[in-house]
């Protein structure tokens, strides 16, 4: 296997237990978007596994009937199993165990010739999972690096920019490196060996449940436990609970015990809930008010009505139509499903399945015995479901394993080694002598090197305008009454720590307040939400983001999906979706691989990864001199590159290092014949390049589809109106 292929941490979660009987005989159903591999026979599973990990030739999977015995013997030797050559119970158990997705090798191994040429390694946490609080994720990664720093002369410094040696990213499905994740319990994580570009980076599948290895981590608020996390399971009035509950209370506020036995210890806290606080919006973090009025209708729970992005929200007064005050409802991680076809939704109890009512998660209907729930009240009619939270995977252990790969280590055949390909949870110091021998073979022994300043900042960038999230000052009064008392009033509002960034935009109709971020640069002629984009002569910027064409103008934007019958969405406040941005933009661009979104205004650039922003950064940092006053647009190329345009010139731009090649600058007409040299919006849409000037666009089809804009001049194939032909205005 080429060392340039990423190391895929694959979870083959095919349980061997059968579902509990529903009637006399268990009834099994096909769940929408479920893993098909769960229906494989043992032999089919073994054949697929042996082929995937290099033990059999591709010809055997093409229909040639050959014995599996030689391949099984190799597998058993590699995994230190009894070498029977048979598909016995121990071998099947190993096949069903979480593991990395690369062919296995012998005792401690390193990627030949691949190691860092310096011992002061930098890393950047590009984005976060919502499964754990950010400080816990930061701590898990720091501890994972420290494992290797304890036994080798290596230091690890966290930085806040893409110049880092190791870029850490959470992603789902196709996340930008050409090696997509496949949802819950498939590929768990992967990393690349040392080197430039994507080499050395570590990616984690955000469809998994990340924990400390012992179940979901739920921080608590108020109560009498000083913010200690929930302890699952816990006992209350003799009954065991594996999630937050409202039992024992008459105000509907979910709570949990922070020890194993509430009946004995009496320690508790309140779980994240809209009854305690809301996130973002314009309600100043106040809790939801139920019921509330929206568009003349009464709501007694959080809703997604009026939104196109699926985020749950509520009013923070009794009447949204009158007061226009709202916030977003906190996520209930303990009750949020993973996988299935409703990832991120909440379990709905009770729900109906095969005519029977369920008030808790069940394994009925499944051959693998895994717990699941419906996310609507009736699975039989809606077919919406997901897996209930399980113990999750230790982010610390998986990260320590992946960072071993990022430092140059391959897999070990020693079962006790951290670099052994099969995942297992363990406590204490995770390194085995085999791991230590491997890392010291690469980097030697001895004390840590003297620290040297990294090439990028080691302090987290601060927002350029006051944040819009709710205040972090604790309330003056904390409820300390235990859950059995059942007070009639809700706990005092206000979380004790900053909430994570929230969703975008306001419920329809949108708030009338101007943007609160970047307000110093806002246009003096603010666009009215009622204005029709078909009346806009020239847009500030146009870009394809998340499959939708975005049209920006004076701090607002519209979204257009090119689907038959799909309505134009918006207007939305730009500052609600991307709070750090100014009101006026010059251009925007989404990296098709990493899904990072680049924004340009004047001589500044912002880069959004999900809800995390880097910037503003000066164009000087990109290698562009003062003569470049703005960026007109970017077009993607292969291998993490793009073309960057300004004033009739074009540069080659590296999307990871965020640097232009100063030797690459040429005139636009050398690559694109017939387009306006002074185009103000340049973007790619549906694999074609668009150059806009005034009300018109010039569309270019690439002549060289393999290398896009290499070697051949690309010709204009259409000229049209932005509003009539792109926005499809009447």
Swiss-Prot record:
Organism lineage string: Eukaryota, Metazoa, Chordata, Craniata, Vertebrata
Active site: 402
InterPro entries xrefs: FN_type2_dom, FN_type2_sf, Hemopexin-like_dom, Hemopexin-like_dom_sf, Hemopexin-like_repeat, Hemopexin_CS, Kringle-like, M10A_MMP
Catalytic activity: Cleavage of gelatin types I and V and collagen types IV and V
SMART domains: FN2, HX, ZnMc
Gene: Mmp9
Induction: Up-regulated by ARHGEF4, SPATA13 and APC via the JNK signaling pathway in colorectal tumor cells.
Cofactor(s) recorded in Swiss-Prot or TrEMBL: Zn(2+); Ca(2+)
Cysteines engaged in disulfide bonds, as pairs: 230-256, 244-271, 288-314, 302-329, 347-373, 361-388, 534-729
Purpose: Matrix metalloproteinase that plays an essential role in local proteolysis of the extracellular matrix and in leukocyte migration. Could play a role in bone osteoclastic resorption. Cleaves KiSS1 at a Gly-|-Leu bond. Cleaves NINJ1 to generate the Secreted ninjurin-1 form. Cleaves type IV and type V collagen into large C-terminal three quarter fragments and shorter N-terminal one quarter fragments. Degrades fibronectin but not laminin or Pz-peptide.
Keyword Zinc: yes
Region (Disordered): 442-529
Name by which UniProt lists this protein: Matrix metalloproteinase-9
Transcription regulation as UniProt keyword: no
Annotated Low complexity bias: 478-489
Location of the Fibronectin type-II domain: 225-273, 283-331, 342-390
Provenance organism: Mus musculus (Mouse)
């Amino acid at each position: 296997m080429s060392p340039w292929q990423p190391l895929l941490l694959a979870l083959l979660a095919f349980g061997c237990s059968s579902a509990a009987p529903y009637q006399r005989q268990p009834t099994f159903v096909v769940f929408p978007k479920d893993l098909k591999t769960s229906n494989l026979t043992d032999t089919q599973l073994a054949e697929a596994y042996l082929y995937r990990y290099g033990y059999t030739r591709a010809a055997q999977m093409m229909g040639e009937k050959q014995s599996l015995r030689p391949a099984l013997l190799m597998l058993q030797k590699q995994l230190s199993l009894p070498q029977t050559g048979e598909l016995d119970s121990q071998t099947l158990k190993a096949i069903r165990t979480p593991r990395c997705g690369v062919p296995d090798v012998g005792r401690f191994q390193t990627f030949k010739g691949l190691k860092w040429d310096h011992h002061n390694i930098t890393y950047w946490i590009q984005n976060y999972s919502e499964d754990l609080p950010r400080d816990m994720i930061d701590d898990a990664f720091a501890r994972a690096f420290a494992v290797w720093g304890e036994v080798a002369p290596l230091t690890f410094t966290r930085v806040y920019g893409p110049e880092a040696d190791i870029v850490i990213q959470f992603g789902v499905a196709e996340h930008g490196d050409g090696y997509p994740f496949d949802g819950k319990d498939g590929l768990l994580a992967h990393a690349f060996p040392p080197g430039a570009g994507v080499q050395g980076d570590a990616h984690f599948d955000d469809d998994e449940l990340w924990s400390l290895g012992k179940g979901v981590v739920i921080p608590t608020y108020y109560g009498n436990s000083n913010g200690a996390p929930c302890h699952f399971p816990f006992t209350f009035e003799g009954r065991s609970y594996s999630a937050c509950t409202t039992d024992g209370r008459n105000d509907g506020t979910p709570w949990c015990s922070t020890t194993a036995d509430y009946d004995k210890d009496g320690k508790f806290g309140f779980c994240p809930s809209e009854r305690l606080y809301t996130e973002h919006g314009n309600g100043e973090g106040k809790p939801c008010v139920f019921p509330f009025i929206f568009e003349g209708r009464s709501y007694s729970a959080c809703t997604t009505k009026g939104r196109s992005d699926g985020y749950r929200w509520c009013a923070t007064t009794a009447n949204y139509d009158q007061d226009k005050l709202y916030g977003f409802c906190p996520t209930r991680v303990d009750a949020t499903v993973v996988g299935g076809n409703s990832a991120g939704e909440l379990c709905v109890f009770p729900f109906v399945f095969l005519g029977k009512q369920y008030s808790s998660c069940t394994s009925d209907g499944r051959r693998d015995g895994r717990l699941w729930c419906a996310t609507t009240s009736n699975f039989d009619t809606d077919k919406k479901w997901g897996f209930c939270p399980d113990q999750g995977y230790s982010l610390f252990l998986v990260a320590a394993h992946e960072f071993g790969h990022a430092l140059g280590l391959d897999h070990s055949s020693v079962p006790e080694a951290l670099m052994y390909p099969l995942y297992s949870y363990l406590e204490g110091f995770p390194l085995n002598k085999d791991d230590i021998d491997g890392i010291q073979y690469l980097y030697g022994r001895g004390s840590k090197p003297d620290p040297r300043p990294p090439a990028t900042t080691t302090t987290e960038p601060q927002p350029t305008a006051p944040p819009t999230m709710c205040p972090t000052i604790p309330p003056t009064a904390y409820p300390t009454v235990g859950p059995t008392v059942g007070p009639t009033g809700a706990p005092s509002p206000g979380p004790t720590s900053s909430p994570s960034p929230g969703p975008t935009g306001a419920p329809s109709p949108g708030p009338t307040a101007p943007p609160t971020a970047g307000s110093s640069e806002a246009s003096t002629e603010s666009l009215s939400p009622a204005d029709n984009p078909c009346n806009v002569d020239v847009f500030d910027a146009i870009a394809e983001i998340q499959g939708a064409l975005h049209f920006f103008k004076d701090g607002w934007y519209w979204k257009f999906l090119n689907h038959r019958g799909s309505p134009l969405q918006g207007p939305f406040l730009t500052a609600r979706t991307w709070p750090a941005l100014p009101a006026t933009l010059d251009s925007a661009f989404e990296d098709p691989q990493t899904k990072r979104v680049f924004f340009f205004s004047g001589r500044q650039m912002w880069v959004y990864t999900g809800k995390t922003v880097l910037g503003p950064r000066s164009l000087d940092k990109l290698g562009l001199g003062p003569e470049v006053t703005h960026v007109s647009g970017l077009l993607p190329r292969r291998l993490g590159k793009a073309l960057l345009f300004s004033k009739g010139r074009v540069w080659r731009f590296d999307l990871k290092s965020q640097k232009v090649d100063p030797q690459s600058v040429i005139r636009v007409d050398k690559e694109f014949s017939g387009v306006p040299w002074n185009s103000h919006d340049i973007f790619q849409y549906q694999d074609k390049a668009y150059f806009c000037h005034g009300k018109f666009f010039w569309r270019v089809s690439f002549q060289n589809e393999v290398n896009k804009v290499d070697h051949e001049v690309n010709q204009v194939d259409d000229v049209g109106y932005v509003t009539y032909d792109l926005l499809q205005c009447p």
